Structures are given as structure tokens and as C-alpha cells.
């Protein structure tokens, strides 16, 4: 497996030149464009990795699957999906278009920024600190890594420049789609996006999802089966922003990307995968990371379709 991963990384390193690091968050623009790594965890608990698999980077939008799991556990799926939809979108992840066009003003799915902000508001906690503390502890639990923490520099950078997210949140507040203190909810959202992880952490979360919520390392149930299945389904339909259909056709496994360059993926009942490629395409997905997953999926016949 390690030889295969090494070959796949080298085969797809050429794609880095076609992407750019995220620049709209100043702290992310400092990232090394050439980072490329992969980690794979099997249902048997075996771990393989190559490249920059142990380099820390911020989770960004991959945190949306973490908070979605937690919000469903806290509130039940019926309540969560009464506040946020579950349909794919053809618009960008930070678009306001559907919020204005739809009569309910409900965000179209939990993987776009507007939807994730509403989901963050549904995580239980008496204030923003308690909500984020629960998100951080849950991230540590599902990854099996108690050392995971927030990158405060990225958090401050996001908070200072998150004007589009503020616009989305205040628009939803004006229509009644978002309840609570907007600045406190945004603080939770900016913090969750600034959690620092590695490819190895993502692969361990991925294999837990691949195993329907059970840790292959301990045999313990970490997430209810129905929650794991809901999240995997949303990952397939919405996880790669407005490139989710293309990803499903060419790779065919549940995945979620983040503008920090990470992608988490899982092949149900087979493996979890974490990829890092900091150079992004115009949709905000890792360009080399996507190509790596495409080759891995073809080599191992991972597609669920």
C-alpha cells in the first residue's frame, strides 16, 4: 500500500502548478503551495501514509461534517433538517443567492457556509465557549487524537476578514433562518474552521465513518449508525461544493474538502482517507488532492456506484 501511495503522489504532483493557495483568508495565503500528503486507515486498523501526512493544517470546511454530526446527536435529524436543507447546489460555497431566492430562506444544505453557520448555532452549549469546547472535544474523540487544538492565528485572521460570512449570517438573522446572537454563532464557526489537524487525523475520522460510526481501533461506537449514514450521504451530494457531481462520477466515494487544502474521504466498509494538497482549484477544492483520490479510487475500485 505504501508503494502505491508513493506512486500516486508522484504521479499527481504536476497538478500543483495549476492551483493556488486560498488568499481571501490572509493567514492561509502563507501556506506552502507544494504540500502534498495522503493517509489511509483500513477497517482492520492498519495505517499507511506518504508525503506530508503529518503536517498540520486547518480543517476549514471539513469541520462542517463534525458539527453536523454533533448537531444531529444533540437535536435529532428532523429538527436539524427543518432548519437547513439537504439538496446539492450549483452555486459557490459562500453564495447568498439561494438564501434570497428560496421562499423559506433556509440554507440549501449544511456544507455551504450559510448552512454550516446555522448548524453551528444548533450545537448544544450555554454560550459560544461551551459550544466550541464541545466541538473541539468531539473532534478529538472521533480522530482519537487528544492533542488536536485551534490555530489562534488563523482564527484571528478569519474573524478579521470574514465579511461574507457576516453578511450571510445577518441576512439569515433578518429572515428568521438564524436564531441567537449572530456574533457569538460566528465566533463558534470561525473557531471550528481554525482547528488544526493532519491527514492522519482525517483518515481516522474517515475510517470511523466507513465503519458506520464504530472505531476499528477500539470497537467502540463513537457516532450513532444513522448519523454516520446521513453524513456520508450529504458528503456524496454536497461535500465537494458545486463540483460534487463531477467528483461522484470520477471518484465515487463520500468526501468533504476544505480551503486549507484537506480532503476527508471514506470508502464504506473499506477505509478512511485523508489528503492534503494546499493548491486549490477555482471551486476551492485541492487540485492535486482530488487527482490523488481519483487515481486511488480507480486502482482500488473504491467507487460506491
UniProtKB/Swiss-Prot annotation:
<comment type="similarity">
    <text>Belongs to the glutaminase family.</text>
</comment>
<feature type="binding site">
    <location>
        <position position="113"/>
    </location>
    <ligand>
        <name>substrate</name>
    </ligand>
</feature>
<dbReference type="GO" id="GO:0004359">
    <property type="term" value="F:glutaminase activity"/>
</dbReference>
<feature type="binding site">
    <location>
        <position position="189"/>
    </location>
    <ligand>
        <name>substrate</name>
    </ligand>
</feature>
<feature type="binding site">
    <location>
        <position position="241"/>
    </location>
    <ligand>
        <name>substrate</name>
    </ligand>
</feature>
<feature type="binding site">
    <location>
        <position position="158"/>
    </location>
    <ligand>
        <name>substrate</name>
    </ligand>
</feature>
<dbReference type="GO" id="GO:0006543">
    <property type="term" value="P:glutamine catabolic process"/>
</dbReference>
<dbReference type="InterPro" id="IPR012338">
    <property type="entry name" value="Beta-lactam/transpept-like"/>
</dbReference>
<feature type="binding site">
    <location>
        <position position="61"/>
    </location>
    <ligand>
        <name>substrate</name>
    </ligand>
</feature>
<dbReference type="GO" id="GO:0006537">
    <property type="term" value="P:glutamate biosynthetic process"/>
</dbReference>
<comment type="subunit">
    <text>Homotetramer.</text>
</comment>
<feature type="binding site">
    <location>
        <position position="259"/>
    </location>
    <ligand>
        <name>substrate</name>
    </ligand>
</feature>
<feature type="binding site">
    <location>
        <position position="165"/>
    </location>
    <ligand>
        <name>substrate</name>
    </ligand>
</feature>
<keyword id="KW-0378">Hydrolase</keyword>
<protein>
    <recommendedName>
        <fullName>Glutaminase</fullName>
        <ecNumber>3.5.1.2</ecNumber>
    </recommendedName>
</protein>
<dbReference type="InterPro" id="IPR015868">
    <property type="entry name" value="Glutaminase"/>
</dbReference>
<dbReference type="Pfam" id="PF04960">
    <property type="entry name" value="Glutaminase"/>
</dbReference>
Amino acid at each position: 500500500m505504501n508503494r502505491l501511495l508513493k506512486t500516486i503522489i508522484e504521479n499527481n504532483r504536476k497538478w500543483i502548478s495549476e492551483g493556488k493557495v486560498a488568499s481571501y483568508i490572509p493567514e492561509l495565503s502563507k501556506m506552502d503551495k507544494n504540500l502534498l500528503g495522503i493517509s489511509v486507515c483500513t477497517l482492520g486498523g492498519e495505517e499507511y501514509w506518504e508525503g506530508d501526512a503529518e503536517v498540520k493544517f486547518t480543517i476549514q470546511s471539513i469541520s462542517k461534517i463534525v458539527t453536523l454530526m454533533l448537531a444531529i446527536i444533540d437535536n435529532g435529524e428532523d429538527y436539524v433538517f427543518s432548519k437547513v436543507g439537504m439538496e446539492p447546489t450549483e452555486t459557490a460555497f459562500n453564495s447568498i443567492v439561494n438564501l434570497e431566492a428560496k421562499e423559506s430562506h433556509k440554507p440549501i444544505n449544511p456544507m455551504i457556509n450559510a448552512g454550516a453557520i446555522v448548524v453551528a448555532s444548533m450545537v448544544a452549549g450555554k454560550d459560544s465557549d461551551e459550544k466550541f469546547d464541545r466541538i473541539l472535544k468531539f473532534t478529538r474523540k472521533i480522530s482519537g487524537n487528544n492533542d488536536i487544538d485551534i490555530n489562534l492565528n488563523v482564527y484571528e485572521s478569519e474573524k478579521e476578514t470574514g465579511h461574507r460570512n457576516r453578511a450571510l449570517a445577518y441576512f439569515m438573522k433578518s429572515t428568521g433562518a438564524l436564531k441567537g446572537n449572530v456574533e457569538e454563532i460566528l465566533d463558534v464557526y470561525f473557531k471550528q474552521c481554525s482547528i488544526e489537524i493532519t491527514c492522519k487525523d482525517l483518515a481516522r475520522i474517515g475510517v470511523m465513518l466507513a465503519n458506520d460510526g464504530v472505531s476499528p481501533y477500539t470497537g467502540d461506537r463513537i457516532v450513532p449508525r444513522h448519523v454516520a449514514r446521513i453524513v456520508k450521504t450529504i458528503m456524496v451530494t454536497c461535500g465537494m461544493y458545486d463540483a460534487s457531481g463531477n467528483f461522484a462520477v470520477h471518484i465515487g466515494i463520500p468526501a468533504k474538502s476544505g480551503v486549507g487544502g484537506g480532503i476527508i474521504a471514506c470508502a464504506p466498509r473499506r477505509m478512511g482517507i485523508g489528503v492534503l494538497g494546499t493548491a486549490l482549484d477555482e471551486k476551492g477544492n485541492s487540485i492535486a488532492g482530488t487527482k490523488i483520490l481519483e487515481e486511488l479510487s480507480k486502482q482500488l475500485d473504491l467507487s460506491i456506484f
